[in-house]
């Protein structure tokens, strides 16, 4: 059979399309089956980004997914299909190999709130896609923080552990059991998945219960024990995470792959840091990212045979290296590289990319349009400006490890031996916003830096936690910081005096002026010698008698105008303008004589549109672990998270309000991210810490849409639990019926399952039936260990009717469940009041029970 003739039609207007492969055919899955993967199958997944801001450079992503129990034939068919599809889709398609339980972040990002691994093969998959099943008994093991997965495991207490979450799914009853070591964020995300399963597969009809503390949920444990049997012994300990640290991901090696005769040659070319010029357009290259992921890069002039062999070569490399079979593989084409691939290199030149693909060369203009910054946050993000810098400014500096105010006349005059706090207050759509910059001089001490951070915490407390914080290193100030001082930022060598006074300009000093506008101009003191000059810029040479304003031959009008503005910072000296090549003798004498210096013109800096990356931060064994969220939106920011947004020029750490003690690690995590980055990023990159509900436009502008009121409606985990349980009476009804269970396992009936389950299954055969949990089984349990965790059988109580009927909660006898007051009646009183036996009553539909209880004073 010719696979090419059986390729499915591609709908370019659908973001996600999934096929299951079987017998040389690709069978499409309906959308409601997306995210469910059967372990004996292989799948093909195509993602075509629909939003320009959510793309990876405009490329599509083609994945083939391998179930852990898939046959060799199914795997081979999947490979053949994806290779033919990739050829049909063209060079703008990135090919991924995914293995069950070890999928890439890109793959997981398609499926919210998570992926589900199910037992079975093609028949089970197609049956699931066609019908809505209520006759279900399964246990799902739920794992993950940002990328959640649920795996079907054996119905046994042996499947449980203390650190994860398990969902006992009984069709119309779904019990989420939370391990005592599970975090609140894991519980919340698991509950979101549970609710999604209820709504997608059960039409919202199933009832959800949550076990957070077993001693407070004895009724629910009775149901679990009916299904799982008696639990003997303690639970298994938490399973260590298999997360890959950033340090391991930073270990990158590049290989050239080619054929010499009949031999395949794999030659190592370079290790970290890699440079883009190593990739030649007529070659094929393999990039090994610490054994965590293998990339195959194909030059646009490489042969069709080489392109077709890329995947098999990557798999062969994995086997030769002894890496796990589930190691991720990504095949990328020249010009369609993902952002993750590009950032493995020390730099990814748009100039080189533009020469190959001129149609992609669109420069983002850097002109500041102040009026649009508040209404167009995407512009604010690109220009890195929350406004034009005209707001209120307060400045402090660290002296003797204390925060001291700087006199306003010295604002913008910083010293390399000090640390400064710059508090900027501005209005955004009628609301007061704060941005606190922490500026660190190159010659400041470690003690000063600690005092700087402590002072920032104090200021944050004074402003009720509303400060966004920007950690700035001398010489790497962001545009908005420069705009605050209207282009007059001058950094002196040495330490500040009283009230932040600059060092006295008594000796000869040389200052380098760089910039053309108020938001990109800084003036830095440099060694006063001729070799510090460059022909492309402007310099001030200050002596005891005169201030020379030196214009290099390569500088242009905007630079000269800004320099004339900055020179006003140095009052009192006679000012003389000197052109390069026309310097007076005294100019050179002041610099200690002539010396060679760079004479090339400064090229204008280009600001390119880049694809930002969003990561969830966590720590494992003391190392930073990042989980990337692709195609991200505001909904990916969870109140329990610390998220890292990398825009290349800046790093943002977003702190959810419930992130807890990890908030203190945010800046350290940002520095570790830069330090362990495969591209060896500069540690001077500005790091901004922003808090939930106080995000500046320079952060929100990187998101497709942003709702400033979203956080006002955010729910706590406890509120999520309450809302997930449906009407307040629903869970009470279920637990009331649990007290009717007489749990008696029959060991001789293992194949059929627990007798209680047989009764329970019978009540679920029709999705139209109301929930009926009559799991009572007569007889004693001869094998029950009284020291085990199994609950004792509930014996019907007998209380006078007057102590139960029409009684408020506080007036009920101790131990009476207010949701099932009628249960404590004697059998004769129950028959007399309700006109039927308890057995007949509890076999009624729930709404009928509720109606009768309300009428007779038991609600």
UniProtKB/Swiss-Prot annotation:
Highest taxon, organism lineage: Eukaryota
Alphabetized GO MF terms: actin filament binding
BP term (GO), one: cytoskeleton organization
Residue ranges annotated for the HP domain, each copy included: 793-859
Segments passing through the bilayer: none
Entries under Pfam families matching the protein: Gelsolin, VHP
Keyword set includes Calcium: yes
Disulfide cysteine pairs (residue numbers): none
Keywords, alphabetical: Actin capping, Actin-binding, Calcium, Repeat
Placement of Gelsolin-like repeats on the sequence: 24-76, 148-188, 264-308, 401-450, 521-561, 624-665
Keyword Repeat appears in the UniProt entry: yes
Task of the protein: Possible tumor suppressor.
Family to which the UniProt record says this protein belongs: Belongs to the villin/gelsolin family.
PANTHER family (UniProt xref): VILLIN (PTHR11977), VILLIN-LIKE PROTEIN (PTHR11977:SF30)
Listed name of the protein: Villin-like protein
Naturally occurring in which organism (per UniProt): Mus musculus (Mouse)
Higher taxonomy: Eukaryota, Metazoa, Chordata, Craniata, Vertebrata
């Amino acid at each position: 059979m010719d696979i090419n003739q059986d390729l499915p039609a591609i709908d370019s207007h659908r973001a996600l399309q999934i096929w299951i492969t079987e017998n040389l055919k690709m069978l499409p899955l309906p959308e409601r089956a997306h995210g469910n993967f059967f372990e004996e199958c292989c799948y093909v997944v195509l993602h075509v980004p629909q939003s320009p801001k959510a793309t990876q450079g405009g490329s599509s992503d083609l994945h083939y997914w391998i179930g852990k129990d898939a046959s060799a034939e199914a795997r081979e068919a999947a490979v053949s299909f994806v290779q033919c599809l990739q050829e049909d889709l063209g060079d703008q398609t990135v090919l991924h190999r995914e293995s069950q339980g070890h999928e890439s972040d890109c793959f997981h990002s398609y499926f919210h709130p998570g992926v589900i691994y199910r037992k079975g093969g093609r028949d089970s998959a197609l049956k699931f896609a066609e019908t809505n099943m209520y006759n279900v008994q399964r246990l799902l093991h739920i794992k993950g923080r940002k990328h959640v997965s649920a795996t079907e495991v054996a119905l046994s207490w042996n499947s449980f552990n203390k650190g994860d979450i398990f969902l006992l799914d009984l069709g119309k009853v779904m019990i989420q059991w939370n391990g005592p070591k599970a975090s609140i964020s894991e519980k919340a995300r698991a509950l979101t998945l549970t609710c999604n399963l209820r709504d997608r597969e059960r039409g919202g009809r199933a009832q959800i219960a949550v076990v957070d503390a077993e001693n407070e949920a004895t009724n629910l444990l009775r149901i679990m024990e009916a299904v799982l049997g008696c639990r003997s012994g303690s639970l298994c300990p938490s399973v260590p995470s298999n997360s890959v640290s950033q340090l391991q991901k930073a270990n990158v090696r590049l290989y050239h792959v080619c054929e010499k005769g009949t031999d395949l040659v794999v030659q190592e070319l370079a290790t970290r840091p890699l440079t883009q010029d190593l990739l030649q357009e007529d070659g094929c290259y393999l990039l090994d990212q610490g054994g965590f992921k293998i990339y195959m890069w194909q030059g646009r002039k490489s042969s069709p045979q080489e392109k077709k062999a890329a995947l098999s070569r990557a798999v062969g490399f994995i086997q030769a290296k002894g890496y796990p079979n589930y190691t991720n593989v990504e095949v990328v084409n020249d010009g369609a590289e993902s952002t993750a691939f590009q950032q493995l290199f020390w730099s990814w030149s748009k100039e080189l990319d533009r020469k190959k693909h001129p149609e992609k060369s669109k420069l983002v203009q850097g002109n500041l349009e102040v009026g649009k910054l508040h209404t167009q946050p995407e512009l604010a993000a690109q220009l890195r400006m929350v406004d034009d810098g005209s707001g209120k400014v307060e400045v402090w500096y660290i002296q003797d490890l204390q925060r001291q105010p700087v006199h306003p006349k010295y604002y913008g005059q910083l010293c390399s031996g000090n640390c400064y706090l710059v508090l900027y207050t501005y209005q955004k759509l009628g609301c007061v916003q704060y941005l606190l910059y922490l500026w660190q001089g190159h010659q400041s001490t470690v003690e000063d830096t600690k005092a700087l951070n402590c002072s920032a915490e104090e200021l944050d407390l004074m402003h009720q936690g509303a400060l966004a914080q920007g950690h700035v290193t001398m010489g790497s100030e962001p545009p908005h910081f420069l705009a605050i001082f209207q282009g007059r930022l001058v950094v002196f060598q040495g330490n500040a005096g009283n009230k932040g006074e600059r060092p006295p300009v008594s000796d000869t000093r040389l200052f380098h002026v760089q910039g053309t506008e108020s938001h990109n101009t800084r003036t830095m003191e440099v060694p006063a010698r001729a070799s510090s000059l460059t022909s492309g810029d402007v310099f001030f040479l200050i002596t005891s008698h005169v201030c020379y304003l030196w214009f290099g031959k390569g500088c242009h009008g905007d630079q000269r105008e800004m320099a004339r503005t900055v020179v006003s910072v140095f009052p009192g000296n006679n000012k003389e303008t000197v052109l390069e090549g026309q310097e007076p003798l005294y100019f050179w004498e002041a610099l200690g004589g002539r010396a060679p210096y760079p004479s090339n013109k400064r090229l204008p800096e280009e600001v390119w549109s880049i694809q930002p990356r969003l990561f969830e931060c966590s720590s494992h064994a003391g190392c930073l672990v990042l989980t990337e969220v692709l195609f991200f939106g505001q909904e990916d920011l969870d109140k329990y998270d610390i998220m890292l947004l990398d825009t290349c020029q800046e790093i943002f750490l977003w702190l959810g309000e419930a992130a807890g003690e990890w908030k203190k690690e945010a800046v350290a995590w940002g520095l570790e991210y830069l330090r362990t980055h495969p591209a060896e990023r500069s540690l001077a990159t500005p790091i901004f810490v922003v808090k939930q509900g106080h995000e500046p436009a320079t952060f929100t502008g990187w998101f497709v849409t942003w709702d400033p009121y979203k956080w006002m409606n955010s729910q706590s985990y406890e509120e999520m639990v309450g809302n997930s349980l449906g009407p307040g009476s629903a869970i009470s009804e279920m637990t009331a019926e649990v007290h009717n269970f007489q749990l008696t396992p029959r060991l001789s009936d293992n194949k059929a399952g627990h007798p209680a389950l047989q009764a329970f299954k019978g009540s679920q055969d029709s999705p139209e039936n109301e929930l009926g949990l009559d799991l009572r089984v007569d007889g004693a349990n001869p094998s029950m260990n009284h020291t085990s965790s199994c609950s004792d059988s509930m014996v019907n109580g007998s209380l006078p009717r007057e102590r139960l009927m029409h009684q408020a909660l506080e007036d009920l006898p101790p131990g009476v469940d207010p949701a099932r007051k009628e249960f404590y009646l004697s059998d004769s009183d129950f028959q007399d009041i309700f006109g039927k036996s308890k057995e007949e009553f509890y076999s009624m539909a729930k709404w009928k029970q509720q109606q009768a209880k309300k009428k007779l004073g038991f609600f």
